[in-house]
Amino acid sequence: MTLGLVGRKLGMTRVFTEDGVSIPVTVIEVEANRVTQLKTLETDGYTAVQVTTGVKKASRLTKAEAGHFAKAEVEAGRGLWEFRLNDGEGADLTVGSELKVDIFADVKKADVTGISKGKGFAGVVKRWNFRTQDMTHGNSRSHRVPGSIGQNQSPGKVFKGKKMAGHLGCERVTVQSLDIVRVDVERNLLLIKGAVPGATNGDVIVKPAVKA
């Protein structure tokens, strides 16, 4: 199954097994995902389902967004997300139908995608885990510098992709094969073992693990 859900990261807590073992979990609230569009091979060149979740004020919508939601006869949500579908998957879906957390009832592991916390401008020690240079032995004010970043007149440039200081975080990150500890259908909650990318209240995409 490639179909996933969009949820909101509420934070972390822990649950206990029957043996008394403490398991750290991230709580993800998964409100009903409303189908806004079904993409087909004939019209779009690929098969996918587009969903929205949450609510958004009408005054905050662009005309294009308002028209798109009106055409689907779906309440405007806080964004649009798309899931590619395999052959034969999603045959029972229609525009306006809802996807809920119970689709994960039989799923053991999940891949979670989110926008990582932004850290601003960071040096190479924090950004790339470079080791620091000597604190003493004649080293003066070069404790956290990267060191050499190139060769000599040949090639006479710094190669693309060289690990250097720069902006850290605030990028799309996926953590794979996390255990699903509990699916709470009544409260629309997913409890996933360990940490997931993003800040509290950030949107996350939960899919069945591709490497399960």
From Swiss-Prot:
Matching Pfam families: Ribosomal_L3
Post-translational modifications: Methylated by PrmB.
Entry-linked SUPFAM superfamilies: Translation proteins
N-terminal signal peptide: none
Record InterPro entries: Ribosomal_uL3, Ribosomal_uL3_bac/org-type, Ribosomal_uL3_CS, Transl_B-barrel_sf
Region of interest (Disordered), ranges: 135-156
Entry keywords, A to Z: Methylation, Ribonucleoprotein, Ribosomal protein, RNA-binding, rRNA-binding
Modification type N5-methylglutamine: residues: 153
GO cellular component, one term: cytosolic large ribosomal subunit
Origin superkingdom: Bacteria
GO molecular function, one term: structural constituent of ribosome
GO biological process: translation
Keyword Ribosomal protein part of the UniProt annotation: yes
Family: Belongs to the universal ribosomal protein uL3 family.
Assembly description: Part of the 50S ribosomal subunit. Forms a cluster with proteins L14 and L19.
Job description of the protein: One of the primary rRNA binding proteins, it binds directly near the 3'-end of the 23S rRNA, where it nucleates assembly of the 50S subunit.
Protein name: Large ribosomal subunit protein uL3
Origin organism lineage: Bacteria, Pseudomonadati, Pseudomonadota, Gammaproteobacteria, Aeromonadales
